[in-house]
Design a protein with these regions (language model features):
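Short amphipathic alpha-helical segments
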Residues: 98-105, 159-167
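Active-site beta-strand-loop-beta-strand hairpin of nuclease catalytic cores
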Residues: 148-151
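Short hydrophobic alpha-helical segments enriched in small aliphatic residues
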Residues: 6, 10-11
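Non-catalytic accessory regions of SAM-dependent methyltransferases
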Residues: 16-145
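Non-catalytic substrate-recognition/targeting regions of SAM-dependent transferases
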Residues: 129-136, 140-142, 163-232
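Short, surface-exposed beta-strand-loop junctions and turns on beta-sheet-rich folds
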Residues: 82, 159-160, 227-228
Length: 232
């Protein structure tokens, strides 16, 4: 997991700068898990959420998280419809949540797994982005077939869903693969208050079936659904 804590500030924060953002205030005594690096914030830990009503209702709105004494704790993606009310983007008061951050996180994830991609056969599925592990909560990306193949993305939280365009741009730039497909888990998306969508985000859709080799065993895989059957 990235070092979210670099540059953490607890006092003297310029709150005037953030007057257009949501402010999540954590109940007294409930900030311990955040101080220890826990990236999920549940409703039971939140004292109040201040900000514009439309931002409160929009899944993935960026919020400042503060303690009951108004000390900065984190920046997070807020979702009033989710059991996990907020997912931390960064514990660093100096790190803005913007296109540059998203692209930087995607690049770091791809660079981390570059060796695995190089070793993989063309008919192997490679995990390229692993959600919280890469500082991109709720984002899963698998690659198949290299630059001429397909990237399959799952946006399982409001924060990454709100940054979908920037994420796809960064994935294409980092892999050279222009075929990007979104596959969703209906139960997860529904629980996050997100629309149920499947389809190409860039380039072509995958075929109904591709050949997958895993641990020496061959499967027929539908990249669009994730379903596989033993190859005969």
């Amino acid at each position: 997991m990235p070092d979210y804590h670099q540059g953490r500030h607890h006092a003297g924060f310029n709150w005037i700068y953030w007057n257009n953002m949501l402010i999540i205030t954590i109940k007294q005594g409930k900030e311990k898990s955040l101080l220890e690096g826990q990236p999920w914030i549940y409703a039971s830990a939140i004292e109040k959420v201040d900000g514009k009503p439309q931002e409160k209702m929009k899944p993935g709105s960026t919020a400042i998280v503060q303690s009951s004494s108004q000390q900065f704790l984190a920046r997070a993606a807020y979702n009033s419809k989710s059991q996990i009310r907020a997912r931390v983007w960064s514990f660093d008061a100096n790190e803005a949540v913007d296109h540059a951050m998203i692209k930087r996180r995607v690049k770091l994830a791809l660079d981390k797994r570059a060796a695995a991609v190089t070793r993989a056969w063309r008919n192997q599925l490679v995990a390229l982005v692993k959600a919280e592990e890469d500082g991109l909560p709720g984002l899963l990306v698998d690659g198949y077939g290299g630059a001429e193949g397909y990237l399959v993305c799952q946006f399982q939280a409001g924060g990454v869903d709100a940054w979908k365009v920037a994420i796809v741009q960064a994935l294409i730039a980092g892999t050279g693969c222009r075929n990007v497909y979104e596959r969703c888990d209906p139960l997860i998306r529904k629980g996050e208050g997100l629309p149920i969508v499947n389809g190409a985000l860039s380039g072509d859709e995958p075929p109904d079936e591709v050949l997958l080799t895993e641990n020496g065993v061959r499967f027929a895989l539908d990249l669009k659904t994730g379903e596989r059957s033993k190859f005969r």
